[in-house]
């Protein structure tokens, strides 16, 4: 099991320690909800994103910090476009499109602004169709998960 009960307990323990340290220095912490493995990775589990969602949401709520729903954005993008390549070939790390989706999700979560219409495309590396699709996914997931209206 990728995220065993023991691993989730350790995550909660160390997240709290780091969050407390950040807060003690008059700063705001946030949790970057990671994405699940790609379905071709040997340790992929069909319910992995649900385990990740529950763990990050619980720790975020317990510590009163923002949870940036990058993992849920990956999941929704794969649901809507199963052939999109968000992961690198190793199946664990984000590729170019996954990194772009994560950046749009971080932007929307931190600033409460919609990423739809942002012009940045990594120096022309992301085509218009993918760019618009990923911006829409980030907008939808962020506004739904955080229960916010993005401007």
Feature roles, as predicted:
Residues 1-96, 108:
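Alpha-helical cap/lid subdomain in secreted, periplasmic
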Residues 86, 93, 103-151:
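Conserved catalytic region of serine esterases and O-acyltransferases that act on ester linkages
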């Amino acid at each position: 099991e990728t995220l065993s009960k023991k691993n989730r307990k350790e995550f909660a323990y160390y997240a709290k320690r780091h969050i407390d340290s950040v807060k003690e220095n008059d700063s705001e912490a946030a949790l970057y909800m990671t994405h699940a493995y790609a379905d071709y990775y040997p340790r992929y589990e069909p319910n992995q994103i649900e385990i990740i969602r529950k763990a990050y949401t619980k720790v975020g709520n317990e510590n009163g910090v923002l949870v940036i729903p990058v993992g849920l954005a990956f999941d929704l993008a794969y649901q809507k476009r199963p052939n999109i390549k968000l992961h690198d070939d190793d199946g664990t790390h984000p590729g170019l499109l996954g990194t772009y989706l994560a950046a749009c999700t971080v932007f929307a979560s931190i600033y409460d602004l919609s990423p739809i219409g942002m012009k940045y495309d990594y120096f022309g590396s992301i085509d218009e169709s993918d760019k618009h699709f990923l911006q829409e996914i980030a907008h939808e997931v962020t506004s739904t998960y955080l229960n916010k209206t993005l401007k």
